[in-house]
Amino acid sequence: MWRLKIGEGNGDDPYLFTTNNFAGRQTWEFDPDGGSPEERHSVVEARRIFYDNRFHVKASSDLLWRMQFLREKKFEQRIAPVKVEDSEKVTFETATSALRRGIHFFSALQASDGHWPAENAGPLFFLPPLVFCLYITGHLDEVFTSEHRKEILRYIYCHQKEDGGWGLHIEGHSTMFCTTLNYICMRILGESPDGGHDNACGRAREWILSHGGVTYIPSWGKTWLSILGVFDWSGSNPMPPEFWILPSFFPVHPAKMWSYCRMVYLPMSYLYGKRFVGPITSLILQLRKELYLQPYEEINWMKVRHLCAKEDTYYPRPLVQELVWDSLYIFAEPFLARWPFNKLLREKALQLAMKHIHYEDENSRYITIGCVEKVLCMLACWVEDPNGDYFKKHLSRISDYLWMAEDGMKMQSFGSQLWDTGFAMQALLASNLSSEISDVLRRGHEFIKNSQVGENPSGDYKSMYRHISKGAWTFSDRDHGWQVSDCTAHGLKCCLLFSMLAPDIVGPKQDPERLHDSVNILLSLQSKNGGMTAWEPAGAPKWLELLNPTEMFSDIVIEHEYSECTSSAIQALSLFKQLYPDHRTTEITAFIKKAAEYLENMQTRDGSWYGNWGICFTYGTWFALAGLAAAGKTFNDCEAIRKGVQFLLAAQKDNGGWGESYLSCSKKIYIAQVGEISNVVQTAWALMGLIHSGQAERDPIPLHRAAKLIINSQLESGDFPQQQATGVFLKNCTLHYAAYRNIHPLWALAEYRARVSLP
C-alpha cells in the first residue's frame, strides 16, 4: 500500500537540505506488505468507484491519505448527522451540529506538523515531461519503480476522454498538447502502439492523426518533442539565450517578465541554445513514424513553426508576434548559432543562463518555482554535467512533487500546504469553538509561524531579478522560498488572529518584528493603480503581452494585479492597523484607500469581479466584497458592494446554491453550470460574500437557503462531497484544490452561525 509521509527527509541523502526541518514536506512511499486485507480492499474499491464515475466527477476525492490518517487516528464520528427538510428552518442548534461534525472530521485530517495535506493538481501536462526527463537522463528506472509506473498509467487512463484524447486539464476538452504528451508517456512506460487499458494508445494516436498530427502541437509541445528527438528544433520558434545578456533597460529583457514566464524560458533558452536532443533510441524512431501524417524526413520544419491545433488555441498569436519570430528565425538565429557569434555571444549567454538556473535552484532548495520549471531546470543541469551535484540535488526533490490518490499518481503544481492551512485556520477560528480544538489550532499556528520565510534570496538578489522575500509566506512551505502576496496576507492575518487569543489555547504569538517584515512585503507589492501583484512588483509595459509565446494561456508575460491578492492584503493590513496602530500607519492607511479604489474599478458591468485563481466570478466577488468590507465600505455607502450583492443574488439557484462553470474563466463571462447543479464550495464563497456585505441585516432568506444546501450536502462522516474542480490559473487551466470541499463549507457555516440571527 501507498503511505503518505510528513516532514521527513530522504534518510541520509547528502543532496537534500532544508531551512526548517522539512515542515510541510509531503512524500509518498510504497510498502509492499502494508495494510490489512480490508484496508487494501478499500483502496481497490475507491479506485473502482472513481473509474466508473470518471466522466461525471473528474477531480479525485483524495481518498488514499485521508483513509490512512483516519485509520491511524482511529477516527469515529460521534456527532449525529443533521438534515434540514424543505419545510424546516435552519436553527442555531442545527448549524452548530453540522459545523462541529465537519470540524471533528477535518481536524482528524491535520498532519503532525500542523498543516493539511491535499492534492493540488489537475493540469495534464505536468507529469509527462518528468517522465521524458528521466527517460533522457537514464534515471527512469531509478526514480520510478514498477508501482510508480502502474499508478502513473492509472492516472493517464483515468483522465483519457471518451474521444481518446486528454484535455489541458481534467475538466477540459481534448487537446493536441496533452494528448501527445500522454501518448508518448504511455509509450515510454512500456505500452505498445495499440496497448494500454481499453486501447488507450490506439485511441490516442487516432485522435492525434485525425487532428493533423503533431506538427499542430503548441509551442511548449514542440519544445519538448524537439528535446526528445521526436521533432526537429528548426520547427520551433527561436528562444535565444542571448536575451539574458541584453541591457536591463531593453524592453523585452527577462527581468521585466512575470516570474513564472521567466523561469520557464530560462532553461528552455538554454536547451534551445544548445540544440540539445536526447538519445535517439528505437522508441524515438518509432514515435517519429507513429505521430505524423507524412514521413518525418519530408516535413518542412520551417512551415510548421506557427501551426497550432484549434483545440489548443486560446491566445491566437497576433501578426506582430509572428513577425518577431520570423525575424529572429530568418535573420538572427543563423548568425548567433555560427562562428564567431556562437563563441562571442552564445557561449556567454548560455553560461549566464546556467548561472541563473543554479541561483534559482539553490534558493528554492531545488524545488524551483513550480513543476513545469522544475523539470526543465533539472534537465538543463544534467545537460551541463550529467554526474554533477546540481542534478543529484534535483533528483532528491522529485518526490516532493508526486501525489497519490484513487485516480493514480500525478504531479502537483508544487503543493498548497500554507495556502490551505491559512484558509483552514481562518475557518476554524471563525467557528468560535477554539476551546474544543485547541490542539488543532496550536499545531496549525506553529506550522504557520515555522513556514514564514526568514531571509531574502541570497547574495545580490536584485542582479538576479529577484524581489525581497524576508517576512513572506509561500504557497507551499518555507523551503520553496518564493514570496506570494496573498499567501503572505493570509499568513499575517492568521498570526494576528492567533495573537488575540490566549497562548494557553493557541500557543505563543509570532514575534512582532516578523509581522513587520510581512507588512513590508505587502506594501512593496502595491502598484500605482492600487492593485496588488502576486510575486513581484509590476512595472513592465502592458504591450509586452503581445509577445505571449504560448497559445494556451493568457496574461503570462508580465506581472499583473489581481483582485484576490488586493482583497487579501486589505484584510490583513486592516487588522494589523487595529492591533499595531503605531507601525507605518500613514502608509497602511494610504495603501488600503488605494486598494479599495482598485477593487471598485475592477468590477465588471454585471456587478461581479473576475476570479484569477478560483472559478470564477463567484470566487472573485467573494474576495472583493470581503476586501471592501475590511476597508470600511458598506452596502449603504458603496455602490460596488450593492452591485456585487445584486450579482450574487441573481446567480443563486432555486435549490439555494451557486454553481459556476469553469468556462467562465476562459470566456470571461459568467456561465452557470447546466441545470440545478450547485457546487458546495462555490455556494460557500457566495454565502460568505453576502455575509460580508451585511445581507443578514437586509434579507437573510438567501443566506438561510444557502446554508441549508451546505448542511444537507454534508456526508455521514462529516466530510463534504467532491464535485468539480474549483481552482484555475492563467485564465484557461483548472486546478484541483482537494481541501477546498472541507475548508470553505466549514468557513461559511462558521460565519453564518456567528453573524446571522438564528432561532
UniProtKB/Swiss-Prot annotation:
Pfam families: SQHop_cyclase_C, SQHop_cyclase_N. The keyword Isomerase applies. The active site is at D486 (proton donor). Keywords: Isomerase, Repeat. It catalyses: (S)-2,3-epoxysqualene = beta-amyrin. PFTB repeats lie at residues 149-190, 592-632, 641-682. Converts oxidosqualene to beta-amyrin. This is Beta-amyrin synthase. It comes from Arabidopsis thaliana.
